[in-house]
Amino acid sequence: DVDGLLAQVKETHPELDVLVPAEVGAGMMKNAFAGTFDILQTNIAGVYADGSQGLTAYNIYASDEFMDVAKLAYDWNQKGYYIADSTTLTDTRQTFLKAGSCFGYVGPIHPGTKTQESINSGCDVTVIPITDCVTGTSNVAGFQYTIPTGSDAPEKALAVLNMIYTNPAAQNLLHYGIEGSDYVEVRDGVAGYPEGVDGTTVGWTNETWLTGNGSIGLAWETDPDNIWAQYEEFNNNATFSPAYGFTFDSANVKTEITAVQNVLDKYTAMIYSGMADPEEAVAQFNSELEAAGMQNIVDEMQSQLDAWSAE
């Protein structure tokens, strides 16, 4: 009962902001909706990630699921669970956690999130899964290392990439900083803080999932020693989108995507933060999306999905 937990926190600790944004400017509940659709790298249209509707493309913001999240966001905002001015804040979630001024946030998780967030915030963070794990093309294509065609030293750039995927020492440096100053090997294969250092004083922090092949480096002492095996299980047991591997070519609808994005920028953070009655706001939102060319985008995506599935 997440609602009951948040109510208890608000009653017991009125000095805290119960929830803060997971991402600056994205709204409070964006991540509560993130796993419903495979958005096919658009954040505009997509297919149901669980495969329940096959390869049918939808305007994701006209779905019942989006309305449900909008209603929940509005309800929680009315109950005072959200930090004030959540859509215009510039501080990160880690800043609020470090200051001890909030209870938590709704964000994406994976094995090791507890360690990642604890290190970056200096707090002992607890992670509670509230949705199922799904995998779509955006999950694997959204964060890639590339070598620009105009690189002055492509061979050296490739050598760096090769190093961070094959060299354990490079992984540990990127993950945890300088050995002896920022971390020590507390036992075989496991790193921790040196004596006198903690998450608030350490000289280096990083989003550990961004650094290439983390599985060749040290685990962190707050994670299970088999954290990398847990990653493998996590990935293998996720529900895979029926459009996994499909990439949408937006060339034919660039004008519509620009217009639709302007509407998204106007409404999504506001709706995800419960700052407008969803019964009125979502209807107006979708009316403006249609006027901006949403249906053309959906139709183009459907055409490409049909061609892709026929290959």
Predicted segments with their positions:
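Helix-loop-helix "hinge/cap" segment bordering the ligand-binding cleft or interdomain interface
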Residues: 1-32, 43-88, 149-155, 163, ...
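Extracytoplasmic/secreted envelope proteins and their assembly/folding machinery
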Residues: 3-6, 70, 74, 94, ...
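Short, glycine-/small- and polar/acidic-enriched structural segments
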Residues: 21-43, 108-111, 126-131
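Short, solvent-exposed loop/beta-turn-alpha elements that line the ligand-binding surface or hinge
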Residues: 39-65, 117, 123, 128-135, ...
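Glycine-rich, aromatic-lined ligand/substrate-binding cores of catalytic
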Residues: 74-78, 93-192
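Conserved small-residue motifs centered on glycine
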Residues: 156-269, 273-275
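Histidine-centered catalytic/metal-binding microenvironments
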Residues: 270-311
